[in-house]
Structure formats: structure tokens, C-alpha cells
């Protein structure tokens, strides 16, 4: 069995995980401060993940071990689970089924859980035009988990956008697994501010909620676009922020006129919520 040992944890090397999947990894797990990436054959890896080493190890059922370590993740009114744990969702919770795979976002990372909790705290079903359900924009959608969570929580329409084309079919498949019709959740490759992300003919010219699980420097860059895509007073949910980077995010939101800025901390990670300018 061919295993690539990469120093670090799934948290500290979060930005590199998609590089391993794209290089052909068939599974990832973390043991003792080392990420173990399983491959069928040795392959050339990008520079960002070249600080590890290849090892031949005795065969084992790593997939069974990987499944054994995954547990349901409760986030507000939603419980995120892989397909084989769906029956473990508690009564009264909304099951959100995500197949672990190439796109980041299975709910086990604090940033994903914080964002779903923030969505759960909003009354999405009563927002939007005439109270028919919020219009939600998920920036950097990955597996689609946040857009799907929004739909499960009552959003009338959710759009998940990502610059990585690999994620889009995965997100669509996850929406289908969860029984969310394409009329309520869509996924598209695109960049906020560079591509049209509204559907005026369908009443989606702005959004009631924008949620983005990115990183602080991108939030700083996109703060103006967040404001432009939100209705006056709309809800902004930002995560993927290291606590040491919070001043950068606060400064960006202040610059763009956001109000009611609040933060939630979980270890080294932070979530920031705010309200868009009223005009």
C-alpha cells in the first residue's frame, strides 16, 4: 500500500487537501500530527505539498478505518453525516448527507460547522421577497454543504459558486443525495465580482444572505462585493478566519459600512457575522 506522509494536521493543512485529492489520492486521514494520503501509484505532487515522504506499508482496509473514525456532526438544527451514518441522526434534526470526497466540506472542520450553526440561527424560511424563503449565496461552495444546509433550513433559493470546476458536479450530486431540487439550489463555476451571479428573471437580483468559508485575505478583498450582492441589511456570514487575522476582517467590514459585526471563536478559528449597509 502506497502512503504519502505529509507533516501537519487536517486543520493546519486545510488549503492543501484539495491538491492531494486532485493528484489522485484515494483517501486521507490524520494520525499523530501527520496527514496520511493513500495513492494507487506514486505521482508527482505540486510544490505546496512536496514536504512529505512516500512510504510502502502493509495493506490494510484503510477505507473501513476511515469510515470508522467519522462521526455525525451536529450544527444547530442540522446534523452532517456520511451516507452510512444517516440512521444515527437524532429525531428532530435535519440530516445533511455528504459523501466524503474531492471537495472540501464534510462538516468535521470547525469552519464548516460554525457556518452551518450561523445559518441555522437565521429564520431562512421567512426571509426573502414576501417571506417565501431567503435567497442565499454561498461563496467558495466546495462540496456544496452550506448551500444545501441553507435549502434544508428553508431558503427559497441558494446558489453555490466556486472557482474550482472540479467541485461543481460533486456539489450537484450532494444536493441530489439530499433531495434538493435544482430549482432551489444551483451550483456554478465563477468568481464573485467577475461573473453574473444573479437571476433577475427569477426574482434573484440580490441576496438576503451571503455565506463564505474562505480565508481572511479573501474576505478583505471581497468585502465590497459582499455588500453589493446583499439586500440592505442582509446577513453576512464569514468563516475560514484564523483568530489572528480577525483585525483584517473587521477593518474590511468597517470600510464597506457593515454593521452589527459579531464574532464566534472555536480554538484558532473564528466566524464573523454582520449586516449589510442600509443604503
UniProtKB/Swiss-Prot annotation:
Enzyme kind, highest EC tier: transferase
Matching entries from NCBIfam families are given as: PRK00517.3-3
EC id: 2.1.1.-
Q: Which family does it belong to?
A: Belongs to the methyltransferase superfamily. PrmA family.
Q: Check the record and name the HAMAP family matching this protein.
A: Methyltr_PrmA
Organism (species): Deinococcus geothermalis (strain DSM 11300 / CIP 105573 / AG-3a)
Residue ranges annotated as coiled coil are: none
Query: A Pfam family name for this chain?
Result: PrmA
Which catalytic reaction applies to this protein?
Answer: L-lysyl-[protein] + 3 S-adenosyl-L-methionine = N(6),N(6),N(6)-trimethyl-L-lysyl-[protein] + 3 S-adenosyl-L-homocysteine + 3 H(+)
Record's function text: Methylates ribosomal protein L11.
Q: What is one process in the GO biological process aspect for this record? A: methylation
* Localization per record: Cytoplasm
For binding S-adenosyl-L-methionine, which residues are annotated in this chain's numbering?
112, 140, 162, 213
The record's keywords, sorted A to Z, are:
Cytoplasm, Methyltransferase, S-adenosyl-L-methionine, Transferase
- The protein in question is named Ribosomal protein L11 methyltransferase
One Gene Ontology cellular component: cytoplasm
In alphabetical order, the GO MF annotations are: protein-lysine N-methyltransferase activity
Amino acid at each position: 500500500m502506497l502512503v504519502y506522509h505529509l507533516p501537519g494536521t487536517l486543520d493546519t493543512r486545510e488549503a492543501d487537501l484539495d491538491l492531494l485529492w486532485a493528484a489522485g489520492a484515494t483517501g486521507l486521514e490524520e494520525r499523530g500530527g501527520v496527514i496520511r494520503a493513500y495513492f494507487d501509484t506514486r505521482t508527482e505532487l505540486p510544490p505546496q505539498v512536496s514536504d512529505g515522504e512516500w512510504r510502502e506499508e502493509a495493506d490494510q482496509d484503510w477505507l473501513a478505518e476511515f469510515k470508522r473514525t467519522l462521526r455525525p456532526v451536529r450544527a444547530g438544527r442540522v446534523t452532517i453525516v456520511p451516507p452510512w451514518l444517516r440512521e444515527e441522526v437524532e429525531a428532530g434534526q435535519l440530516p445533511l448527507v455528504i459523501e466524503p470526497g474531492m471537495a472540501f466540506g464534510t462538516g468535521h472542520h470547525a469552519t464548516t460547522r460554525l457556518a452551518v450553526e450561523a445559518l441555522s440561527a437565521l429564520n431562512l424560511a421567512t426571509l426573502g421577497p414576501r417571506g417565501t424563503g431567503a435567497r442565499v449565496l454561498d461563496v467558495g461552495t466546495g462540496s456544496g454543504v452550506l448551500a444545501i444546509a441553507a435549502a434544508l433550513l428553508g431558503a427559497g433559493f441558494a446558489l453555490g459558486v466556486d472557482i474550482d470546476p472540479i467541485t461543481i458536479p460533486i456539489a450537484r450530486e450532494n444536493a441530489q443525495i439530499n433531495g434538493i431540487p435544482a430549482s432551489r439550489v444551483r451550483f456554478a463555476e465563477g468568481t464573485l465580482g467577475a461573473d453574473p451571479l444573479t437571476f433577475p428573471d427569477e426574482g434573484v437580483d440580490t441576496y438576503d444572505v451571503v455565506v463564505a468559508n474562505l480565508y481572511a485575505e479573501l474576505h478583505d478583498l471581497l468585502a465590497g462585493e459582499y455588500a453589493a450582492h446583499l439586500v440592505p441589511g442582509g446577513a453576512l456570514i464569514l468563516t475560514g478566519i484564523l483568530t489572528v487575522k480577525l483585525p483584517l476582517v473587521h477593518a474590511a467590514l468597517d470600510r464597506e459600512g457593515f454593521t452589527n459585526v459579531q464574532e464566534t471563536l472555536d480554538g484558532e478559528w473564528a466566524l464573523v457575522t454582520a449586516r449589510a449597509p442600509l443604503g
